Structures are given as C-alpha cells and as structure tokens.
Amino acid sequence: MGKKLVMAQKRGETRALCLGVAMVMCAVITYYILGTTMLPLYQKSVWTQESLCRLIETNIRDQEELEGKKVPQYPCLWVNVSAVGKWAVLYHTEETRDRNQQCSYIPGSLDNYQMALADVEKVRAKFHERQVFYCFSTTQENETSVLYQRLYGPQALLASLFWPTFLLTGGLLIIAMVKINRSLSILAAQK
C-alpha cells in the first residue's frame, strides 16, 4: 500500500512540475512576443500629452472612399476641437488617422451603409453632449491633430501584461509547492 502511494505521489509531482514549467515557458514566450510587438509601439507613440479639448464643430461626410476595402462609400465623422490653445482635428485612435486623414471617426462595420450612418450619428451626439473632454496631443509644435483615445497607452500595456504575469506567478507557485512537498515528504520519511 505504501509503495503504491509513493509511486502515485511521484507521478502527481511530475505532472504538477511539468505543468508549472509549461506555464513559466508560456509566460516567457508571451513576454517575448509582447516585448517585440507591443512595447515598441508604446515607446514610439508621440501622443503622450493629455490635454483638455473643447468641441468646435462636427460634420458627417458621405461618399468617402476607404483604401483597401471593397466598400465604395461610407459615412465618416469630422470633428474640429480646440486643444493646447489652437485648433486641431480630433481622431479616434492612431489607426483612424492612418486609415483616412479626412475622417475623425470611421464606423466599425462598413457593410451596411444605414447602420454605419446610425453609428456615426450616435458618436456625433455623444460629442455634442460632452462639449469638453480629455484628448491626447503631441509635443510637436506644427501638429494640428489630437487623439481621443490612445491604442498603445499605459493601460493597454498593463492589460496585455496581466495574463503572462498571472501565468508566470502561477507556474512558479506550482513549482515551489512541488519542491516544498518533496522536501516535507523526505523529512517525514527520515523520522
């Protein structure tokens, strides 16, 4: 009976140790991937200065063409704001600015024109509700655009690092518990 219990304990310890090592390895790989993809985007982001923006005007523009999409037309929102003591164009994120500089907000689904127009109208109404809001600007003097939301801000970086940290901590705890269990069983066998 005692020998079977020891064999089962060794198998269980081996499996737990393999699980802990696998969790640590997955965390290390994920940290590497995040370090080569997300961290450079965070470091290169120039939109670091948080400013207070005041709404000046909003326009819904139709018949805009989006490069790379098969959708011939879509509505887009154009927003002018006053930020850092000057007029600026507000963009939803960095990607919105890169996709089409004529649009402040591009709806997510471009398949149905009426749904896209309703989405743009809803966003426009929210801007008119809140005339003053926080936005992100750059420290460059000649820049005439600001962002409503940063894609690669500190919150996004911390959110992406949560699960690898959780995996690493869990894996190290499992490995530590197996090692403690082994040392306690050796001490118990010696008595």
Curated annotation (Swiss-Prot):
It is a multi-pass membrane protein. Coiled coil: none annotated. InterPro entries: K_chnl_Ca-activ_BK_bsu. Glycans are attached at residues 80, 142. GO terms for molecular function: calcium-activated potassium channel activity; potassium channel regulator activity. Keywords: Glycoprotein, Ion channel, Ion transport, Membrane, Transmembrane, Transmembrane helix, Transport. The chain crosses the membrane at residues 16-36, 158-178. One of its GO terms (biological process) is detection of calcium ion. One of its GO terms (cellular component) is voltage-gated potassium channel complex. N-glycosylated. The keyword Ion transport applies. Residues 1-15, 179-191 are cytoplasmic. Disulfide bonds: none annotated. It is found in: Membrane. It comes from the Eukaryota. Belongs to the KCNMB (TC 8.A.14.1) family. KCNMB1 subfamily. Interacts with KCNMA1 tetramer. There are probably 4 molecules of KCMNB1 per KCNMA1 tetramer. Regulatory subunit of the calcium activated potassium KCNMA1 (maxiK) channel. Modulates the calcium sensitivity and gating kinetics of KCNMA1, thereby contributing to KCNMA1 channel diversity. Increases the apparent Ca(2+)/voltage sensitivity of the KCNMA1 channel. It also modifies KCNMA1 channel kinetics and alters its pharmacological properties. It slows down the activation and the deactivation kinetics of the channel. Acts as a negative regulator of smooth muscle contraction by enhancing the calcium sensitivity to KCNMA1. PANTHER family: CALCIUM-ACTIVATED POTASSIUM CHANNEL SUBUNIT BETA, CALCIUM-ACTIVATED POTASSIUM CHANNEL SUBUNIT BETA-1. This is Calcium-activated potassium channel subunit beta-1. It comes from Oryctolagus cuniculus (Rabbit). The gene is KCNMB1.
